[in-house]
């Protein structure tokens, strides 16, 4: 299970399988013309994770933001 531990302007810290991972990104200002609240940099995910594990983590982050009515961009 993926747990969001901390979200800052420049990174998201998660715990997954008893390990902590930092995923780099950028927090965005929510404005009328901007529906997105965060950009996640896919290439900042740990290379030791399988592609399935990486997608599991990304999906958990997307669901976290979605539960708050916010959207993310994956780059």
What spans do the regions from the language model cover?
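Acidic, low-complexity intrinsically disordered segments
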Residues: 30-75
């Amino acid at each position: 299970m993926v747990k969001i531990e901390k979200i800052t302007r420049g990174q998201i810290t998660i715990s997954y399988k008893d390990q902590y991972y930092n995923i780099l990104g950028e927090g965005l200002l929510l404005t009328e013309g901007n529906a997105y609240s965060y950009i996640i940099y896919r290439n900042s995910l740990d290379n030791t994770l399988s592609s399935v594990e990486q997608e599991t983590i990304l999906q958990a982050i997307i669901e976290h933001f979605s539960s708050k009515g916010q959207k993310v961009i994956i780059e």
